[in-house]
């Protein structure tokens, strides 16, 4: 019974399906242009409008081009233009890709003009209310189109602006608008030279076609192959509404500029911060719903289980049969969606916006350590945002000073000009990243020599001041733990190189000191902790903190409670030498002459008595024992535990500096032994309270010709040389002298020879060697025989 009922139901459904099929056009297909729509729900009018938009960007058809060339009015380029184009094509622009930057820049200028006119003329935008730049690649026709809805050009302007170089469309416009401007309105946005940058199109194009529509004229076409140009009324009439389309018929080797990715990357690289939206005609794959074909529906129904067929067919009747299909969709894609936040007041920009902009602009993943957003006014006006990265860029000091800095991008009226500067920022600030946008710099073909412009020096000066202000505001804990670790060397180099900002930079310096085992100290903090009558800032340089704090030069200073700054980096001593004073306090290298302490009258008398007592020893050292090695010998005020030290003059090299200079000389292959500073003799300071020195005084008084005492004096000198950070010129002689002193201390005769190893006759040596081999062989045979016996026993 149930089977009969199911069979009847199936027949009924099949009959209904056949009736439905008769009502549907079997030959109907999905509309070919459905994929042109971004959304399946878009209306036909929207699709048509967008397609017409694309067609307007296309090049002229063959018949129209033929008509243009037959009826067009021919013109010769001005002589200066011919020379300029040859200069551009052959040498001026080393990088061809900038042609797109120039064309977009010109489009932006044209949009600026019409926007300004529209403020006083409500009908100015009647032809086209959009203010945009649109770019379309046509691979089939080998054409690239750049369209703007700017002010456009009349026939006369096309001839004048694109055929001559003496008159610039933008500068003429600026002169005309001067009378119309209110005193409170800036005309700097209109500065530029349209006609010059335009010729860069011939870097990549064999032929350039300019279609332009001005509100006060009909639409015209300008065409050139760089030898001559022609102008004619556009036979298509007004297709633009208002604005200009530049069509480039690309050279064979420039076909890469028809690739969407290439064009998009160039727009983002050079023009992402233009004031007006820039669109590129782009494709992407989207999934759309399409009706299911009748044959597919039948196949699905046949595969359906008999027991569920009724239920499924009933559900399908309630909704249309569709399937998901991937389609290529073409539409305008916005390229410059990142707003130029430096154009907004800093109070209106959130911290998260700065961080997001930094990551996009610098291609970094981390947030910046610090940033500053400011507007500079005066001789030159510009807006800027500067950032300190969270970590030092890789290879920060590779080829320091010889490589360009890539981290400051210069814009002129939101148009990227270059980041290839050698002196936009000083070398020591080569880690700072940011943008500079000025309205006062020229935006024309001469930008390749822009870094010679006098206004850049003014910009540089202000950038440095603002950067130092930004660094100064970094919190103390973050500064010491992070900034100084990453960029401390840069600040020290700044003290050496930047005379005008040396005082500001000195306040940013941080060093280790005897005040704390691990914390860094600033010079301000050091001065605050100075003793009441202390008039100098004491420092000691060494290869490490341990070396510096164990130096004999700091003994008395530390004992008396003076704080000593430890310089442990190679650049540190250079840095301090470049800094004559800080807060009225001069620096004193404790490894050099000049360390003196306040002393009472009693202390002074005691010192003078000691000097008189040790005068024989001091004179003997200077005139006899160390005659060719030292400048003079004196009693030391800085030693407490060490017997002696070797002290450089105020203008000589300390031990640390000499080591650095020699290391540099080895790298460069130079010989510094004849250098004035290296060849200077040093002062030999002795500690009159040390037992070695006291005993030497006694021996010299007894017999100043004693060879042992002379050796002792030289050993003390050489030991002091090493402990003072210097290198010995002859280490073998030093070793021999130490050996003699050890012999004396152990009562070993100085002439005692080293016992020689007895030599065996060659024949005896060979016999002994043969005997050893025979013994080894006998032992091996014995061992083998024993192993064989053991095996037999086991068996």
Curated annotation (Swiss-Prot):
HAMAP family named among the record's database cross-references: HSP90
Origin organism of this chain? Gallus gallus
Q: Where in the cell is it found?
A: Endoplasmic reticulum lumen; Sarcoplasmic reticulum lumen
**In which domain of life is the source organism classified?**
Eukaryota
The residues that the entry says bind ATP are 106, 148, 161, 198
Catalyses which reaction(s): ATP + H2O = ADP + phosphate + H(+)
Respond yes or no to whether keyword Chaperone is given for this record: yes
| Protein family membership | Belongs to the heat shock protein 90 family.
Q: Where is this motif: Prevents secretion from ER?
A: 792-795
Please list which residues make up the signal peptide.
1-21
Keywords of the record, alphabetical order, are:
ATP-binding, Calcium, Chaperone, Disulfide bond, Endoplasmic reticulum, Glycoprotein, Hydrolase, Nucleotide-binding, Sarcoplasmic reticulum, Signal, Stress response
The protein's name is Endoplasmin
Pfam families (alphabetical): HATPase_c_3, HSP90
**Residues bearing attached sugar chains per UniProt:** 61, 106, 216, 444, 480, 501
GO molecular function per UniProt:
ATP binding; ATP hydrolysis activity; ATP-dependent protein folding chaperone; unfolded protein binding
Q: Please tell me whether the keyword Ubl conjugation is annotated for this protein.
A: no
Q: Which gene encodes it?
A: HSP90B1
Which residues carry the site feature described as Important for ATP hydrolysis? 447
Basic and acidic residues bias: start-end ranges: 783-795
Region Disordered: what ranges? 289-322, 751-795
Chain's role? ATP-dependent chaperone involved in the processing of proteins in the endoplasmic reticulum, regulating their transport.
Concerning InterPro entries, the annotation shows: HATPase_C_sf, Heat_shock_protein_90_CS, HSP90_C, Hsp90_fam, Hsp90_N, Ribosomal_Su5_D2-typ_SF
Where, by residue number, is the motif SRT pseudosubstrate motif?
A: 41-43
EC numbers: 3.6.4.-
């Amino acid at each position: 019974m149930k089977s009969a009922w199911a069979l009847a139901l199936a027949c009924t459904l099949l009959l209904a399906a056949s009736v439905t099929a008769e009502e549907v056009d079997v030959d109907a297909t999905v509309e070919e242009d459905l994929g042109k729509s971004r959304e399946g729900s878009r209306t036909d009018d929207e699709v048509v409008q967008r397609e017409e938009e694309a067609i307007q960007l296309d090049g002229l058809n063959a018949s129209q081009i033929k008509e243009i060339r037959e009826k067009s009015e021919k013109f010769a380029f001005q002589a200066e233009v011919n020379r300029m184009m040859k200069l551009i094509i052959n040498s001026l622009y080393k990088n061809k890709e900038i042609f797109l930057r120039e064309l977009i820049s010109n489009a932006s200028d044209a949009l600026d003009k019409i926007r300004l006119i529209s403020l006083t003329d409500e009908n100015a935008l009647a032809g086209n209310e959009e203010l945009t730049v649109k770019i379309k690649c046509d691979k089939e026709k080998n054409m690239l189109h750049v369209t703007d809805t700017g002010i456009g050009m009349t026939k006369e302007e096309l001839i004048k602006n694109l055929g001559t170089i003496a008159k610039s469309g933008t500068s003429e416009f600026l002169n005309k608008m001067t009378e119309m401007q209110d005193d409170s309105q800036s005309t700097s946005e209109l500065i530029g030279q349209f006609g010059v940058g335009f010729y860069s199109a011939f870097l990549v194009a064999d032929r350039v076609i300019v279609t332009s529509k001005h509100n006060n004229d009909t639409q015209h076409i300008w065409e050139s192959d760089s030898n001559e140009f022609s102008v004619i009324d556009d036979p298509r009439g007004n297709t633009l509404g208002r604005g200009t389309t530049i069509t480039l018929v690309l050279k064979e080797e420039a076909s890469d500029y028809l690739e969407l990715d290439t064009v998009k990357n160039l727009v983002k690289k050079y023009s992402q911060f233009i004031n007006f939206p820039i669109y590129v005609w782009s494709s992407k794959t989207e999934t759309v719903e399409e009706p299911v074909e009748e044959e597919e529906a039948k196949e699905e129904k046949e595969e359906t289980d008999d027991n569920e067929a009724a239920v499924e067919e009933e559900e399908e009747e309630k909704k249309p049969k569709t399937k998901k299909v991937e389609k290529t969709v073409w539409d305008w894609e916005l390229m410059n969606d990142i707003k130029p936040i430096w154009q907004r007041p800093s109070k209106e920009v959130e911290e998260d916006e700065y961080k997001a902009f930094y990551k996009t602009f610098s291609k970094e993943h981390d947030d910046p350590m610090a940033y500053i957003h400011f507007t500079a006014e005066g001789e030159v006006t510009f807006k800027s945002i500067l950032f300190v990265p969270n970590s030092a860029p890789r290879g920060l000091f590779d080829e320091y000073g010889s490589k360009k800095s890539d981290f400051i991008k210069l814009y002129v009226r939101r148009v990227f000009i270059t980041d290839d500067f050698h002196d936009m920022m000083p070398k020591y600030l080569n880690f700072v990243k940011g943008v500079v946008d000025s309205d006062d710099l020229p935006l024309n073909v001469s930008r390749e020599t822009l870094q010679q412009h006098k206004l850049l020096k003014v910009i540089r000066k202000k950038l440095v001041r603002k950067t130092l202000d930004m660094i100064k505001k970094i919190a103390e804990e973050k500064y010491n733990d992070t900034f100084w670790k990453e960029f401390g060397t840069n600040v020290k180099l700044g003290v050496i190189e930047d005379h005008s900002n040396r005082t500001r930079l000195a306040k940013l310096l941080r060093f280790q000191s005897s005040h704390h085992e691990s914390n860094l100290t600033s010079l301000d903090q050091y001065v605050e902790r100075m003793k009441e009558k202390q008039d100098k800032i004491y420092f000691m340089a060494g290869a490490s903190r341990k070396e510096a704090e164990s130096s004999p030069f700091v003994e008395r200073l530390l004992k008396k409670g003076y704080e000593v700054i430890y310089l442990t980096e190679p650049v540190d001593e250079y840095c301090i030498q470049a800094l004559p004073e800080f807060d009225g306090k001069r620096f004193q290298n404790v490894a050099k002459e000049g360390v003196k302490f306040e002393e009472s009258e009693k202390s002074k008398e005691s010192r003078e008595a000691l000097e008189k007592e040790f005068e024989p020893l001091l004179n003997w050292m200077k005139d006899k024992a160390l005659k060719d090695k030292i400048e003079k010998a004196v009693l030391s005020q800085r030693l407490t535990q060490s017997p002696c030290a070797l002290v450089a003059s105020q203008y000589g090299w300390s031990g640390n500096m000499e080591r650095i200079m020699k290391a540099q000389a080895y790298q460069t292959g130079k010989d510094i032994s004849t250098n004035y500073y290296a060849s200077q003799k040093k002062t030999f300071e002795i500690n009159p309270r040390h037992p070695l020195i006291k005993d030497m005084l006694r021996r010299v008084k007894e017999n100043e010709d004693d060879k042992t005492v002379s050796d002792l004096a030289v050993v003390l000198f050489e030991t002091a040389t090493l402990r003072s950070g210097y290198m010995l010129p002859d280490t073998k002689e030093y070793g021999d002298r130490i050996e003699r002193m050890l012999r004396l201390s152990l009562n070993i005769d100085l002439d005692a020879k080293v016992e020689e190893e007895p030599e065996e006759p060659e024949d005896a040596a060979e016999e002994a060697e043969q005997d050893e081999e025979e013994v080894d062989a006998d032992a091996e045979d014995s061992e083998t025989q024993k192993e064989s016996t053991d095996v037999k026993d086991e068996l």
